């Protein structure tokens, strides 16, 4: 049995505009009625369920499309986990700098050595373990 977009929107919690966008982008292709209404069958509803879980994992539509077009889910998810781990490392480093500055304030720059400001920052971070 087919569902119309209004029913699918209500059932899924996804806006009609988003459902239309998914169809337009080929992520959630749907059948059309004689009057060109979008019609969702059980298979399409199952695919929408998968899309929502992939979105919950933080995958973007490009990544979701790769999976739906046949790329191994494990590969896409592993890449996503690697990106997340990298972001976590960057944020942890930024947090260290913030905590250092909260404790000691911004270090005084030196005009006497011939280092650039960026090089001085790198040196201070290295010396202070920040």
Q: What spans do the regions from the language model cover?
A:
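Short, charged amphipathic alpha-helical surface segments
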Residues: 52, 65-124
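Basic helix-turn-helix/winged-helix DNA-binding cores
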Residues: 1-66
């Amino acid at each position: 049995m087919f569902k119309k977009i209004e029913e699918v929107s209500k059932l899924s919690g996804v806006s009609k505009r988003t459902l239309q966008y998914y169809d337009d982008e080929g992520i959630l292709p749907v059948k059309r009625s004689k009057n060109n209404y979008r019609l969702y069958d059980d298979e399409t509803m199952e695919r929408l369920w998968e899309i929502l879980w992939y979105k919950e994992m933080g995958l973007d539509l490009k990544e979701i499309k790769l999976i739906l077009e046949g790329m191994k889910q494990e590969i896409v998810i592993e890449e996503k986990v690697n990106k997340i781990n990298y972001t976590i490392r960057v944020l942890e480093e930024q947090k260290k700098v913030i905590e250092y500055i909260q404790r000691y304030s911004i270090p005084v720059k030196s005009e006497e050595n011939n280092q650039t400001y960026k090089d001085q920052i790198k040196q201070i971070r290295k010396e202070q373990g920040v």
